[in-house]
UniProtKB/Swiss-Prot annotation:
Leading EC class: oxidoreductase
Signal peptide extent: none
Locus of motif Histidine box-2: 141-145
The gene coding this protein: FADX
Tissue: Expressed in developing seeds, but not in leaves.
InterPro entries the record matches: FA_desaturase_dom (IPR005804), FAS_N (IPR021863), Fatty_acid_desaturase (IPR012171)
Stated name of the protein: Delta(12) acyl-lipid conjugase (11E,13E-forming)
Species this chain originates from: Impatiens balsamina (Balsam)
Length: 383
């Protein structure tokens, strides 16, 4: 028993040393955004309305197929088989929904087509059907891209300093505590972020994606926030009418649970895209846009990469060129990887294992060496 403590401490030191050696460089890179753009074939920046609509129709057909199977055949199964069939349906449909969300997200970046009005129309319909305020998130998400990895200004997952940690942060190092926090984040993280900016950028007053007067938005955007709210009211009304016709339990089984899984996937994927022990964060004295965009990690979700339209394994190039359509991102990533060198971070750790590991390791940020590299911070968990 007496050797457990020192052994664990030795492992921790070795882990931290290895992480330090594998870190993404924090110095200004030897290349510019223009250098990267010149290396990418011009066709990678071309948006095709036909191709984009193909992906929308493709996903809607798959969504409809699984809905039809679930609604018409699962209730006919023996009860024991229903207990297996419903969770399978929920998992599949939640993943398909995430793919549709990515297409709506692409509309918000004007990466869907050459026509802004088409992008906004399609994105508004897709996201409203998923109870997401399209324009509201479009504007806040754009600010995330403008301030990625900035401790003070990034819109999502702003890291805390050690002195600012909440009282419950210490339980992230405890398996039970970490499990409960992950469960809570996956279940409530996305709706609470939209509702009251939970785990979002700190503002001087209440912030919500549903409030047109929220400090998240400027005066030009407030009318579109109202339009987003109107879209959600209509979506909720449709769901209410469906519940009256089919029953509340039916609606929960067919739409509700996949919706919850969609919400969990949003949190899981976005957290892992920018949270890693080897990625730097910057305060305002050191931050610049390019280094912030490079503070991004591509991850491997296996066959789900394709279902998610490669938002998972091509996220860095998306941050560099937000109007690039997803079906060109893989090619562009491979082209710029040799130029990026050590500035490109890829982690093939299975995503659930990565979530568990990084949730425990990335608790707060601090500067490594006092007096050196001021403005550059790294994740730590030494509580």
């Amino acid at each position: 028993m007496g050797e457990v403590g020192p052994t664990n401490r030795t492992k921790t030191k070795l882990d931290k040393q290895q992480e330090s050696e594998n870190r993404v460089p924090h110095e200004p890179p030897p290349f510019t955004l223009s250098d990267l753009k010149k290396a990418i074939p011009p066709h990678c920046f071309e948006r095709s309305l036909v191709k984009s609509f193909y992906h929308v129709i493709h996903d809607i057909i798959i969504l409809s197929f699984f809905y039809y199977v679930a609604a018409n055949y699962i209730p006919m199964l023996p009860q024991n088989l229903r207990y297996v069939a419903w969770p399978i349906y929920w998992a599949i449909q939640g993943c398909v929904q995430l793919g549709i969300l990515v297409l709506g997200h692409e509309c918000g970046h004007h990466a869907f087509s050459d026509y802004q009005w088409v992008d906004d129309m399609v994105g508004f319909v897709l996201h409203s059907s998923q109870l997401i305020p399209y324009f509201s998130w479009k504007h806040s998400h754009r600010r995330h891209h403008s301030n990625t990895a900035s401790i003070e200004r990034d819109e999502v997952y702003p890291p805390a300093y050690k002195n600012d940690l909440p009282w419950f942060a210490k339980y992230l190092r405890n398996p039970v505590g970490r499990f409960l926090m992950i469960f809570g984040a996956l279940l409530f993280g996305w709706p609470s972020y939209l509702l009251f900016n939970a785990n979002g950028r700190l503002y001087d007053r209440f912030a919500s994606h549903y409030d047109p007067q929220s400090p998240i938005f400027n005066n030009r955007e407030r009318l579109q926030v109202i339009a987003s709210d109107v879209g959600l009211v209509f979506a909720y009304f449709v769901l209410y009418k469906i519940a009256l016709a089919k029953g509340f339990v039916w609606l929960i089984c067919v739409y509700g649970v996949p919706y919850v899984i969609l919400n969990g996937l949003i949190v899981l994927i976005t957290f892992l895209q920018h949270t890693h022990p080897n990625l730097p964060r910057y305060d305002l004295s050191e931050w610049d846009w390019l280094r912030g965009a490079l503070s991004t990690v591509d991850r491997d979700y296996g066959m789900l990469n394709k279902v998610f339209h490669n938002v998972t394994d091509t996220h860095l190039v998306h941050h560099l060129f937000t109007t690039m359509p997803h079906y060109r991102a893989k090619e562009a990533t491979e082209v710029i990887k040799p130029i990026l060198g050590d500035y490109y971070k890829f982690d093939d750790t299975p995503f659930l294992k990565a979530l568990w590991k990084d949730m425990g390791k990335c608790i707060y940020v601090e500067s490594d060496v006092p007096g050196k590299n001021k403005g550059v911070y790294w994740y730590n968990n030494d509580i």
